[in-house]
């Protein structure tokens, strides 16, 4: 089991990364909440990981915080929730927001995540309620996203990367493009910032 990687961020193509550890490149998929916190390509990075072994592939998922990884593990234990849906849920909602939804049994945000209908949201919240009794929300422990703008990137490539990342989460290409187009004052924003703002707009609308 690979539990943590520490190395150099070699590539960043949302939602995928490659981390170079002593000359070996590890490819990972990460939730957007982790993506927002990553350093620039070429800088040192540490991520907590979860390995999924399938017959046709070994898939590695990365997280900025241990609690993100624990949440991911709780989600994929649920009936009908695979890694893709778990990452979509975690990308649309910060950890503390998802925990509060579970505690309040509030489906309103969950149903805006691709692949989650009302019945599915209700079932997930019920199944997670007992598991989350020990999870207390704390801004200091759970706030994973800063409020400031992220580094500037090429406008055309940033928008294309953002659309691609949203599609990988399950949104339709038209929905993704529309969400990016709806962002005000987006000139010069990084793909990470575009993804963050578009997800916030779609989940909280």
UniProtKB/Swiss-Prot annotation:
* Cell location: Cytoplasm
One MF term in the entry's GO annotations: four-way junction DNA binding
- Main location per the UniProt record: cytoplasm
Keywords (alphabetical) are: Cytoplasm, DNA damage, DNA recombination, DNA repair, DNA-binding
The reply to whether Cytoplasm figures as a keyword in the UniProt entry is: yes
Q: Tell me the segments the record calls region Flexible linker.
A: 144-154
Q: Give me the segments passing through the membrane.
A: none
Positions of region (Domain III): 154-205
What processes does the entry annotate via GO biological process terms? DNA recombination; DNA repair
Q: Where is this region: Domain I?
A: 1-64
Of the GO CC terms on this record, one is: Holliday junction resolvase complex
Keyword Secreted among UniProt keywords: no
Q: Which CDD domains match?
A: UBA_RuvA_C
Matches recorded under InterPro entries = DNA_helicase_Holl-junc_RuvA_I, Hlx-hairpin-Hlx_DNA-bd_motif, NA-bd_OB-fold, RuvA, RuvA_2-like, RuvA_C, RuvA_C_sf
List, alphabetically, the NCBIfam families matched.
Answer: ruvA (TIGR00084)
The annotated subunit structure for this chain is: Homotetramer. Forms an RuvA(8)-RuvB(12)-Holliday junction (HJ) complex. HJ DNA is sandwiched between 2 RuvA tetramers; dsDNA enters through RuvA and exits via RuvB. An RuvB hexamer assembles on each DNA strand where it exits the tetramer. Each RuvB hexamer is contacted by two RuvA subunits (via domain III) on 2 adjacent RuvB subunits; this complex drives branch migration. In the full resolvosome a probable DNA-RuvA(4)-RuvB(12)-RuvC(2) complex forms which resolves the HJ.
What note about domains is in the entry?
Answer: Has three domains with a flexible linker between the domains II and III and assumes an 'L' shape. Domain III is highly mobile and contacts RuvB.
HAMAP family noted in UniProt: DNA_HJ_migration_RuvA
Q: What does this protein do?
A: The RuvA-RuvB-RuvC complex processes Holliday junction (HJ) DNA during genetic recombination and DNA repair, while the RuvA-RuvB complex plays an important role in the rescue of blocked DNA replication forks via replication fork reversal (RFR). RuvA specifically binds to HJ cruciform DNA, conferring on it an open structure. The RuvB hexamer acts as an ATP-dependent pump, pulling dsDNA into and through the RuvAB complex. HJ branch migration allows RuvC to scan DNA until it finds its consensus sequence, where it cleaves and resolves the cruciform DNA.
Report what the protein is called. Answer: Holliday junction branch migration complex subunit RuvA
| Annotated source species | Pseudomonas putida (strain GB-1)
